[in-house]
């Protein structure tokens, strides 16, 4: 059976949790392959229960599904324990969660440096979540990071923390005028936390490849979105990892030839959290309408999301860089009750039309959207379960997005619930 990659095709917050939940009963494994608790997935179960997940894969809410936090994820031990406790308090079985031995741990000094750096930068800040994600990835690349397996050997953990703080305390004290951290206190804190998760540490690469050999289906669940990718996103306003499909193989330990489907998640309009370019951003009543109807508040940060019309330029770009085979279009219902629904089909930069993503950072910042107006619809579409049950104008809108994006729209979300979905083509096939 296949490995399926699920990725956000915009700037994150597209509705990836809903897609994972819908596929849940057809899956045996769900894997987070990058990012950390700087992103969130919201899942609404058929009984109306709502769960916000930050580190743990969305498959944890489906009985009998095995879940993996992969080697490409950076893990805050305290956040992991808090999230596990919250799920268990609500009756969720968390026994099927494994943590890669090679996943890097977010240490207290990562969070301290992240927060103080953003304050220091002021108006020039990137807009991070302040959760230590970037500094942890910096240590990973610099080969001085702490991995999950290190908590199983106190001597190694102590050596790594002491070496890290020898430099980082200089930064905190001499550059940012903050207090130094005590290495032994950091070690003791992490070892105490490790008591709650060390039994989950595993060679997850081996587990996943054995699962594929047995014919089981594995979903590789990305966080954030294509335009936040450190290589392919709107740099420097990006995250510190690779949410794109290429990062799925690296962050899970599954070979790329095992991947048969790349499912992109597209919101029927566009949103973004934090700083950075956003060509279709709205500052009028339409923007306020989308924000209100769509409940556009960040799951992790609580920050209001910026809103705009659908951007086909970035959708085409996402299709290309990810090799997307199928799209799941979410929140189509939010667009009900609009007379017209504009679609950005190209950009204008300094009087020149760009049908594809501009190459330079300056051009994307100065891009002006070129819109195509589509007739809207006023009907409530939340009860539609087949494509033909949608109003004709809604059907036309979906088909136009499909044409502009360059990949088949296999599923359409018409509400937040698992069952509020139209399936035009099965994803697991």
Curated annotation (Swiss-Prot):
Which SUPFAM superfamilies did the record assign?
A: P-loop containing nucleoside triphosphate hydrolases
Annotated residues for binding of Mg(2+): 13, 40
Gene3D superfamilies xrefs = Adenylosuccinate Synthetase, subunit A, domain 1, Adenylosuccinate Synthetase, subunit A, domain 2, Adenylosuccinate Synthetase, subunit A, domain 3
Gene Ontology molecular function, alphabetical: adenylosuccinate synthase activity; GTP binding; magnesium ion binding
The protein's Enzyme Commission number: 6.3.4.4
Give the pathway annotation. Purine metabolism; AMP biosynthesis via de novo pathway; AMP from IMP: step 1/2
Using the UniProt record, give the first listed, main subcellular location: cytoplasm
- Cite the binding residues for IMP: 13-16, 38-41, 129, 143, 224, 239, 303
Q: Which InterPro entries match?
A: Adenylosuccin_syn_GTP-bd, Adenylosuccin_syn_Lys_AS, Adenylosuccinate_synth_dom1, Adenylosuccinate_synth_dom2, Adenylosuccinate_synth_dom3, Adenylosuccinate_synthetase, P-loop_NTPase
Q: Which Pfam families match?
A: Adenylsucc_synt (PF00709)
Return the cofactor note field.
Binds 1 Mg(2+) ion per subunit.
In terms of PROSITE patterns, this protein maps to:
ADENYLOSUCCIN_SYN_1 (PS01266), ADENYLOSUCCIN_SYN_2 (PS00513)
Q: Write down what this protein is called.
A: Adenylosuccinate synthetase
């Amino acid at each position: 059976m296949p490995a399926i990659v699920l990725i956000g095709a915009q700037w994150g917050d597209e509705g990836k949790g809903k897609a994972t939940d819908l596929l849940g009963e057809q899956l045996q494994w769900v894997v987070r392959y990058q990012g950390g608790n700087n992103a969130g997935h919201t899942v609404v179960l058929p009984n109306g229960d709502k769960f916000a997940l930050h580190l743990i894969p969305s498959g944890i809410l489906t009985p009998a599904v095995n879940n993996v936090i992969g080697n490409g994820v950076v893990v805050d031990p305290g956040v992991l324990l808090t999230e596990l406790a919250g799920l268990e308090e609500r009756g969720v079985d968390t026994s099927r969660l494994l943590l890669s031995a090679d996943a890097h741990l977010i240490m207290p000094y990562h969070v301290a440096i992240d927060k103080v750096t953003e304050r220091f930068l002021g108006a020039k800040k990137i807009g991070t979540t302040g959760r230590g994600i970037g500094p942890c990835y910096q240590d990973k690349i610099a080969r001085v990071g702490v991995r999950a397996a290190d908590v199983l050997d106190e001597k190694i953990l102590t050596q790594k923390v002491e070496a890290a703080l020898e430099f980082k305390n200089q930064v905190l004290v001499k550059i940012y005028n903050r207090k130094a951290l005590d290495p032994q206190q950091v070690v003791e804190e992490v070892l105490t936390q490790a008591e709650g998760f060390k039994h989950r540490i595993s060679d997850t690469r081996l587990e996943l490849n054995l699962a594929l050999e047995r014919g089981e289906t594995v979903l590789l669940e990305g966080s954030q979105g294509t335009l936040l990718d450190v290589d392919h996103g709107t740099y420097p306003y990006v995250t510190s990892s690779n949410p794109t499909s290429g990062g799925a193989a690296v962050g899970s330990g599954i070979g790329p030839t095992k991947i048969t489907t790349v499912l992109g998640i597209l919101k029927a309009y566009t949103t973004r959290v934090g700083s950075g370019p956003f060509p279709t951003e709205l500052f009028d009543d339409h923007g306020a309408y989308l924000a209100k109807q769509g409940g556009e508040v960040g799951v992790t940060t609580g920050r209001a999301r910026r809103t705009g019309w659908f951007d086909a330029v970035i959708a085409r770009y996402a299709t290309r860089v990810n090799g997307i085979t199928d799209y799941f279009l979410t929140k189509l219902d939010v667009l009900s009750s609009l007379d017209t629904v504009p679609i950005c089909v190209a950009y204008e930069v300094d009087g020149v039309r760009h049908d594809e993503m501009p190459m330079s950072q300056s051009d994307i910042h100065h891009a002006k959207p070129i819109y195509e107006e589509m007739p809207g619809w006023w009907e409530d579409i939340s009860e539609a379960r087949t494509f033909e049950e949608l109003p004709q104008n809604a059907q036309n809108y979906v088909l136009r997005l499909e044409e502009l994006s360059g990949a088949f729209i296999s599923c359409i979300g018409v509400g937040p619930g698992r069952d509020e979905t139209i399936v035009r083509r099965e994803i697991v096939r």
